């Protein structure tokens, strides 16, 4: 069986550039990019970035995984994958517990930061971060309200928009 792929707006954007496509969360270019890069290559990179559970439960989402369909995701891992992109493509393990103390207050175990593992070319990570931090990249679909107001002095901020299957939010 096939599927009827469409963008959240219901419109087709034949001349959208990569910046506009990613910034506006266009589905058709996302699926085409996954097709070109290959499902296995893309999934391996996604896992290396920290989204280790995505499509890891015997799920076979095929090209629909490009738009988040067909696979379970752990949001903490998904956020870590984006953090890896923000670190210039370098992965770091998640840290859920920073230290453990006994009843006397003595530290019996303490988390230690480990060196990051480079999994994506820093230039590629920079380009992705640049797109995700560019509010003008989200304007293709008329999302002028999606400026998000991220203004943290001295901090480069980025975000990724998206919609649910029913395009409600």
Annotate each PLM feature.
Residues 1, 20, 24, 71-169:
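A penicillin-recognizing enzyme superfamily signal
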Residues 54-59, 108-110:
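The feature captures the short pre-catalytic strand/loop hairpin that immediately precedes
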């Amino acid at each position: 069986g096939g599927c009827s792929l469409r963008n959240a707006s219901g419109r087709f954007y034949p001349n959208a550039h990569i910046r506009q496509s990613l910034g506006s969360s266009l589905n058709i270019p996302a699926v085409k990019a996954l097709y070109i890069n290959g499902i296995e290559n893309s999934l391996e990179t996604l896992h290396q970035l920290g989204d280790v559970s995505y499509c890891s439960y015997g799920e076979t989402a095929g090209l629909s995984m490009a738009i988040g369909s067909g696979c379970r995701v752990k949001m903490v891992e998904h956020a870590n994958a984006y953090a890896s992109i923000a670190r210039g493509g370098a992965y770091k393990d998640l840290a859920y517990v920073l230290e453990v103390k006994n009843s006397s207050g003595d530290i019996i175990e303490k988390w230690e930061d480990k060196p990051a593992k480079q999994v994506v070319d820093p230039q590629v990570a920079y380009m992705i971060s640049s797109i995700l931090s560019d509010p003008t990249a989200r304007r293709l679909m008329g999302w002028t309200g999606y400026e998000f107001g991220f203004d943290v002095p001295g901090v480069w901020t980025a975000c990724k928009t998206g919609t649910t299957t029913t395009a409600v939010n």
